[in-house]
């Protein structure tokens, strides 16, 4: 069984996942994410999709919230897709995470599937960084 922290992260991400059409060119909330900072605080974010591709993924949005609140390091991340399933961060999110925690990124835990309790690490998903 997933520990209580994973469960709380999942619940908090689910609570902000509210799809909404903001304008003819912008929608938000289809995907939601939660990150666990090294201090134990959970930060959430939702994806923001725009017609001109200037949107942002839920994972990066959650990390931006963490950074805005003065924290710079995290140890866990999860994302809930629009179909209710969990999934791996996209390439852009992985790149951002690696740049944020260049020396420690390989140990960041990623929830791949809540129902199957499948967890991997960012190091497994991104074994070699291009820089």
Indicate residue ranges for each PLM-predicted region.
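Compact, glycine-rich, soluble single-domain proteins
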Residues: 46-58
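Feature captures the catalytic cores and cofactor-binding loops of soluble hydro-lyases/lyases
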Residues: 61, 65-68, 89
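Hydrophobic "anchor" residues
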Residues: 41-42
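C-terminal binding/interaction regions
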Residues: 1-23, 71-131
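Histidine- and/or cysteine-centered catalytic micro-motif in compact active-site loops
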Residues: 36-38, 47-48
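Short amphipathic alpha-helical face segments that pack within enzyme cores
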Residues: 57, 61, 92-95
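Short connector loops at helix/strand junctions that flank enzyme active sites
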Residues: 28, 57, 72-74
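Short beta-strand scaffold segments in enzyme catalytic cores
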Residues: 28-37
């Amino acid at each position: 069984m997933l520990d209580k922290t994973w469960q709380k992260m999942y619940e908090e991400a689910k609570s902000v996942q509210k799809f909404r059409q903001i304008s003819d060119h912008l929608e938000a909330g289809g995907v939601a994410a939660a990150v666990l900072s090294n201090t134990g605080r959970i930060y959430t974010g939702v994806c923001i999709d725009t017609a001109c591709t200037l949107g942002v993924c839920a994972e990066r949005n959650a990390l931006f919230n963490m950074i805005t609140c003065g924290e710079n390091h995290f140890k866990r991340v999860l994302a809930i897709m629009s179909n209710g399933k969990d999934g791996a961060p996209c390439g852009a999110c992985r790149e951002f995470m690696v740049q944020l925690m260049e020396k420690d990124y390989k140990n960041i835990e990623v929830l791949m599937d809540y129902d199957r309790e499948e967890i991997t690490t960012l190091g497994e998903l991104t074994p070699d960084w291009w820089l």
